[in-house]
UniProtKB/Swiss-Prot annotation:
Entry's EC annotation: 3.5.4.16
Pathway recorded for this protein: Cofactor biosynthesis; 7,8-dihydroneopterin triphosphate biosynthesis; 7,8-dihydroneopterin triphosphate from GTP: step 1/1
Originating species: Paraburkholderia xenovorans (strain LB400)
Cross-referenced HAMAP family: GTP_cyclohydrol_B (MF_01527_B)
Matching InterPro entries: GTP_cyclohydrolase_FolE2, GTP_cyclohydrolase_FolE2/MptA
Protein's recorded name: GTP cyclohydrolase FolE2
Gene that produces this protein: folE2
Length: 268
Protein backbone atom coordinates (compact mmCIF):
# COMPACT_ATOMS: atom_id res chain seq x y z
CA UNK A 1 0.00 0.00 0.00
CA UNK A 2 1.33 3.40 -0.97
CA UNK A 3 2.17 5.72 1.87
CA UNK A 4 0.73 9.24 1.54
CA UNK A 5 3.26 12.03 1.50
CA UNK A 6 2.59 14.20 4.58
CA UNK A 7 3.19 17.27 2.45
CA UNK A 8 0.56 16.22 -0.10
CA UNK A 9 -2.66 18.24 -0.01
CA UNK A 10 -5.71 16.42 -1.37
CA UNK A 11 -7.54 18.55 -3.93
CA UNK A 12 -11.01 19.83 -3.02
CA UNK A 13 -12.62 19.45 -6.45
CA UNK A 14 -16.16 20.49 -5.52
CA UNK A 15 -14.89 23.84 -4.26
CA UNK A 16 -13.37 24.77 -7.60
CA UNK A 17 -15.07 27.38 -9.81
CA UNK A 18 -17.60 26.32 -12.45
CA UNK A 19 -17.50 28.06 -15.83
CA UNK A 20 -21.01 27.18 -17.03
CA UNK A 21 -22.59 29.85 -14.81
CA UNK A 22 -25.80 27.91 -14.12
CA UNK A 23 -27.12 27.96 -10.53
CA UNK A 24 -28.71 24.84 -9.02
CA UNK A 25 -31.83 25.51 -6.99
CA UNK A 26 -31.60 22.37 -4.84
CA UNK A 27 -28.72 19.93 -4.41
CA UNK A 28 -28.11 17.55 -1.53
CA UNK A 29 -28.89 14.08 -0.22
CA UNK A 30 -32.14 12.16 -0.39
CA UNK A 31 -33.73 9.21 1.43
CA UNK A 32 -31.21 9.07 4.27
CA UNK A 33 -32.54 6.81 7.02
CA UNK A 34 -31.36 7.99 10.42
CA UNK A 35 -32.71 7.64 13.97
CA UNK A 36 -34.16 10.61 15.78
CA UNK A 37 -36.24 11.50 18.80
CA UNK A 38 -39.42 13.56 18.77
CA UNK A 39 -40.82 15.59 21.63
CA UNK A 40 -44.51 14.82 22.16
CA UNK A 41 -47.17 17.32 23.19
CA UNK A 42 -46.93 15.99 26.74
CA UNK A 43 -43.18 16.64 26.88
CA UNK A 44 -42.04 13.03 26.57
CA UNK A 45 -39.33 12.02 24.11
CA UNK A 46 -40.30 9.37 21.56
CA UNK A 47 -37.59 7.50 19.59
CA UNK A 48 -38.28 6.76 15.93
CA UNK A 49 -36.51 6.49 12.56
CA UNK A 50 -36.65 9.28 10.01
CA UNK A 51 -36.20 9.39 6.26
CA UNK A 52 -34.35 12.63 5.56
CA UNK A 53 -33.99 14.84 2.49
CA UNK A 54 -31.56 17.75 2.84
CA UNK A 55 -30.55 20.24 0.15
CA UNK A 56 -29.19 23.73 -0.42
CA UNK A 57 -28.96 26.26 -3.22
CA UNK A 58 -25.69 26.13 -5.18
CA UNK A 59 -24.42 29.37 -6.76
CA UNK A 60 -23.61 29.48 -10.48
CA UNK A 61 -19.87 29.84 -9.92
CA UNK A 62 -19.46 26.86 -7.54
CA UNK A 63 -18.82 23.38 -8.95
CA UNK A 64 -20.31 21.29 -6.16
CA UNK A 65 -21.68 21.21 -2.64
CA UNK A 66 -20.20 19.38 0.36
CA UNK A 67 -22.32 16.21 0.42
CA UNK A 68 -20.69 14.72 3.53
CA UNK A 69 -21.70 17.73 5.61
CA UNK A 70 -25.40 16.86 5.29
CA UNK A 71 -24.86 13.49 6.94
CA UNK A 72 -22.51 15.05 9.49
CA UNK A 73 -25.35 17.38 10.45
CA UNK A 74 -27.59 14.39 11.22
CA UNK A 75 -24.86 12.81 13.32
CA UNK A 76 -24.43 16.01 15.31
CA UNK A 77 -28.13 16.65 15.86
CA UNK A 78 -29.10 15.08 19.19
CA UNK A 79 -31.91 17.41 20.31
CA UNK A 80 -35.46 16.01 20.30
CA UNK A 81 -37.30 17.16 17.20
CA UNK A 82 -39.84 19.96 17.64
CA UNK A 83 -40.47 23.21 15.73
CA UNK A 84 -37.86 25.26 17.63
CA UNK A 85 -35.06 22.69 17.30
CA UNK A 86 -35.97 22.05 13.66
CA UNK A 87 -35.49 25.74 12.86
CA UNK A 88 -32.13 25.64 14.66
CA UNK A 89 -31.12 22.59 12.64
CA UNK A 90 -32.04 24.32 9.38
CA UNK A 91 -29.94 27.36 10.30
CA UNK A 92 -27.03 25.08 11.24
CA UNK A 93 -27.22 23.37 7.84
CA UNK A 94 -27.03 26.67 5.99
CA UNK A 95 -24.01 27.72 8.05
CA UNK A 96 -22.27 24.37 7.62
CA UNK A 97 -22.88 24.31 3.85
CA UNK A 98 -22.17 28.04 3.48
CA UNK A 99 -25.51 28.46 1.70
CA UNK A 100 -28.12 31.21 1.65
CA UNK A 101 -31.08 28.93 0.93
CA UNK A 102 -31.90 25.35 1.84
CA UNK A 103 -34.50 22.80 2.81
CA UNK A 104 -34.82 19.91 5.26
CA UNK A 105 -37.61 17.33 5.11
CA UNK A 106 -37.99 14.36 7.44
CA UNK A 107 -40.73 11.72 7.46
CA UNK A 108 -41.22 9.30 10.33
CA UNK A 109 -43.79 7.04 12.01
CA UNK A 110 -45.29 8.62 15.12
CA UNK A 111 -47.11 6.59 17.76
CA UNK A 112 -49.93 7.64 20.06
CA UNK A 113 -51.09 5.52 23.00
CA UNK A 114 -54.88 5.34 22.77
CA UNK A 115 -57.50 4.07 25.21
CA UNK A 116 -60.38 2.03 23.80
CA UNK A 117 -63.76 3.79 24.25
CA UNK A 118 -65.53 1.17 26.40
CA UNK A 119 -63.11 -1.47 27.71
CA UNK A 120 -60.34 1.03 28.42
CA UNK A 121 -57.69 -1.29 26.97
CA UNK A 122 -54.66 0.63 25.72
CA UNK A 123 -52.81 0.22 22.44
CA UNK A 124 -50.55 2.16 20.10
CA UNK A 125 -51.68 3.60 16.79
CA UNK A 126 -49.20 4.83 14.20
CA UNK A 127 -49.40 7.98 12.09
CA UNK A 128 -47.24 9.15 9.20
CA UNK A 129 -45.66 12.54 9.92
CA UNK A 130 -43.52 14.82 7.75
CA UNK A 131 -41.81 17.98 8.98
CA UNK A 132 -40.40 20.36 6.37
CA UNK A 133 -38.41 23.54 6.86
CA UNK A 134 -37.06 25.82 4.15
CA UNK A 135 -35.22 29.11 4.03
CA UNK A 136 -35.44 31.30 0.92
CA UNK A 137 -34.65 35.00 0.53
CA UNK A 138 -33.97 35.31 4.25
CA UNK A 139 -37.38 33.94 5.29
CA UNK A 140 -37.96 30.56 6.95
CA UNK A 141 -41.15 28.55 6.50
CA UNK A 142 -42.18 25.47 8.47
CA UNK A 143 -44.67 22.80 7.36
CA UNK A 144 -46.21 19.94 9.35
CA UNK A 145 -47.88 17.09 7.46
CA UNK A 146 -49.85 14.35 9.23
CA UNK A 147 -51.73 11.44 7.66
CA UNK A 148 -54.51 10.25 9.97
CA UNK A 149 -56.41 6.96 9.42
CA UNK A 150 -60.11 7.20 10.31
CA UNK A 151 -63.49 5.57 9.57
CA UNK A 152 -66.08 7.07 7.24
CA UNK A 153 -69.69 5.96 6.72
CA UNK A 154 -71.78 6.86 3.66
CA UNK A 155 -74.87 9.04 4.36
CA UNK A 156 -76.55 7.93 1.13
CA UNK A 157 -76.09 4.25 1.93
CA UNK A 158 -77.55 4.80 5.39
CA UNK A 159 -80.55 6.68 3.98
CA UNK A 160 -81.56 4.07 1.39
CA UNK A 161 -80.73 0.86 3.28
CA UNK A 162 -82.78 -0.98 5.87
CA UNK A 163 -79.90 -2.94 7.38
CA UNK A 164 -76.99 -0.58 7.86
CA UNK A 165 -74.63 1.35 5.59
CA UNK A 166 -71.31 0.82 3.89
CA UNK A 167 -68.30 2.18 5.72
CA UNK A 168 -64.56 2.09 5.17
CA UNK A 169 -61.19 3.18 6.38
CA UNK A 170 -60.13 6.62 5.19
CA UNK A 171 -57.04 8.80 5.28
CA UNK A 172 -57.16 12.47 6.22
CA UNK A 173 -53.90 14.21 5.30
CA UNK A 174 -53.22 17.70 6.63
CA UNK A 175 -50.21 19.62 5.35
CA UNK A 176 -50.15 22.88 7.31
CA UNK A 177 -47.79 25.83 7.05
CA UNK A 178 -47.20 27.03 10.59
CA UNK A 179 -46.94 30.52 12.02
CA UNK A 180 -46.73 29.16 15.57
CA UNK A 181 -46.03 25.88 17.31
CA UNK A 182 -48.62 23.19 16.54
CA UNK A 183 -48.27 19.70 18.03
CA UNK A 184 -48.69 16.57 15.92
CA UNK A 185 -51.39 15.44 18.34
CA UNK A 186 -53.44 18.56 17.67
CA UNK A 187 -53.75 17.85 13.96
CA UNK A 188 -54.49 14.20 14.71
CA UNK A 189 -57.32 15.17 17.03
CA UNK A 190 -58.87 17.51 14.48
CA UNK A 191 -59.00 14.78 11.84
CA UNK A 192 -60.29 12.12 14.24
CA UNK A 193 -62.96 14.35 15.78
CA UNK A 194 -64.37 15.31 12.37
CA UNK A 195 -64.48 11.75 10.96
CA UNK A 196 -67.40 9.35 11.31
CA UNK A 197 -65.26 7.61 13.93
CA UNK A 198 -61.61 7.36 14.91
CA UNK A 199 -59.51 4.18 14.91
CA UNK A 200 -57.80 2.19 17.66
CA UNK A 201 -55.09 -0.45 17.49
CA UNK A 202 -56.90 -2.85 19.84
CA UNK A 203 -60.63 -3.19 20.49
CA UNK A 204 -62.75 -5.61 22.52
CA UNK A 205 -66.30 -6.55 21.50
CA UNK A 206 -67.97 -3.71 23.46
CA UNK A 207 -65.55 -1.31 21.78
CA UNK A 208 -66.40 -2.68 18.33
CA UNK A 209 -70.08 -2.11 19.07
CA UNK A 210 -69.31 1.48 20.05
CA UNK A 211 -67.25 2.13 16.91
CA UNK A 212 -69.92 0.65 14.63
CA UNK A 213 -72.74 2.64 16.21
CA UNK A 214 -70.69 5.83 16.47
CA UNK A 215 -69.94 5.77 12.75
CA UNK A 216 -73.59 5.00 11.93
CA UNK A 217 -74.73 8.00 13.96
CA UNK A 218 -72.17 10.27 12.27
CA UNK A 219 -72.27 9.58 8.50
CA UNK A 220 -70.12 11.74 6.22
CA UNK A 221 -69.33 11.97 2.54
CA UNK A 222 -65.69 12.63 1.66
CA UNK A 223 -66.84 16.19 0.87
CA UNK A 224 -68.26 16.56 4.39
CA UNK A 225 -65.06 15.27 5.90
CA UNK A 226 -62.72 17.76 4.20
CA UNK A 227 -65.07 20.69 4.80
CA UNK A 228 -65.45 19.93 8.50
CA UNK A 229 -61.69 19.59 8.96
CA UNK A 230 -61.14 22.78 6.92
CA UNK A 231 -63.41 24.72 9.28
CA UNK A 232 -61.16 23.75 12.18
CA UNK A 233 -57.99 24.72 10.30
CA UNK A 234 -59.50 28.03 9.21
CA UNK A 235 -60.17 28.93 12.84
CA UNK A 236 -56.58 28.27 13.98
CA UNK A 237 -54.45 31.41 13.68
CA UNK A 238 -51.24 29.39 14.04
CA UNK A 239 -51.93 27.84 10.62
CA UNK A 240 -51.37 30.30 7.76
CA UNK A 241 -51.92 27.93 4.83
CA UNK A 242 -52.80 24.29 4.24
CA UNK A 243 -53.42 21.53 1.74
CA UNK A 244 -56.06 19.14 3.08
CA UNK A 245 -56.83 15.78 1.50
CA UNK A 246 -59.33 13.04 2.31
CA UNK A 247 -59.41 9.64 0.65
CA UNK A 248 -62.08 7.00 1.30
CA UNK A 249 -61.06 3.46 0.36
CA UNK A 250 -64.58 2.57 -0.77
CA UNK A 251 -65.78 -0.82 0.50
CA UNK A 252 -68.35 -1.24 -2.33
CA UNK A 253 -66.09 -0.06 -5.19
CA UNK A 254 -62.64 -0.89 -6.49
CA UNK A 255 -61.67 2.78 -6.38
CA UNK A 256 -61.36 5.56 -3.82
CA UNK A 257 -63.41 8.70 -3.27
CA UNK A 258 -61.16 11.74 -2.97
CA UNK A 259 -61.40 15.43 -2.05
CA UNK A 260 -58.88 18.27 -1.63
CA UNK A 261 -59.12 21.76 -0.14
CA UNK A 262 -56.24 24.22 -0.44
CA UNK A 263 -56.12 27.59 1.25
CA UNK A 264 -53.55 30.31 1.85
CA UNK A 265 -54.99 32.64 4.47
CA UNK A 266 -52.55 35.37 3.45
CA UNK A 267 -54.38 35.59 0.12
CA UNK A 268 -57.69 36.31 1.88
Amino acid sequence: MNQMNPAFVMPDVQSTPDTRQIPIQRVGVKAVRHPLTVRTQGGEVQPTVGTWNLDVHLPADQKGTHMSRFVALLEENKAPLEPATFRTMLAAMLEKLEAEAGRIEVSFPYFVNKTAPVSGVQSLLDYEVTLTGETRNGATRLFLRVRVPVTSLCPCSKKISQYGAHNQRSHVTINAELAGDVAVEELIRIAEEEASCELWGLLKRPDEKFVTERAYENPKFVEDLVRDVAQRLNADERIVAYVLEAENFESIHNHSAYAVIERDKRAG
